[in-house]
Amino acid sequence: MGERRTITKGYAAHVAEVQRRWEMALEAEGFDAALIHAGSMLVSFLDDYEYPFRCNPQLLWWAPLLRHHDSALLVRPGERPRLFYYQPDDYWYLPPSDPESWWADQFEVVMANEPDAWLQAGVNESTAYIGDAPCLAEKVGAEQLNPQRLINRIHLERTRKTDYEIACMAEAARLGAIAHTAAEQGFREGLSEYEIHQRYCMSIGLVDAELPFHNIVALNEHNAVLHYQARQQQAPVDIRSFLL
């Protein structure tokens, strides 16, 4: 199995640069601060099943908080970013582990037992709230929630990658190459779409919810479906082509 490596070199410089870009964007759009919310867990209708959590990419730009729903980051020009790190005292679900110093040292970390611990942050100033959690829509005025001009500026800034981001992309490409090679071997062995997908995930130690995109694993005529989402568990008798 491919070993996943944690990229730490250059992270402090990355956060400093992200802070600089946010400060410029906030000043240009007339905001005093920004509150970036990770997002919340969503439950399916009339069920107790929670959809896999996907963190707000604007927060992921700052810190590796892939599984940290209901955390939030307060960004003010000239100040250390304040991270409300949601870590509930829970026995029903496994809460996030304590923050690791290699990244947490760049923030003022506020440990939070309640999901709305951030609520009073930035209330007496012009604050932009960034995220799609239901709690934001309920508690924040529409003019402050996801201001499009500010988001457009940040989108543009994110197109220019820091050295840290480039290193992370290189690591992702390395893992992707391992997984693609494992999938190709599965195809040549005559495995089904489902089995090829499992081979892909096992080769790099990931589960579906951790993949950056829903895997398209298509054999034969399924290649023609642009975003083919099924994974047949029975391999065709005659396997002619493979799309990953």
Describe each PLM feature range.
Residues D47-R54, L191-L244:
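Short catalytic-site patches enriched in acidic/histidine residues
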Residues T8, A12, T159, G186-G190, ...:
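Hydrophobic alpha-helical scaffolding
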Residues M1-I178:
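A composition/biophysics-driven feature that prefers long, compositionally simple stretches
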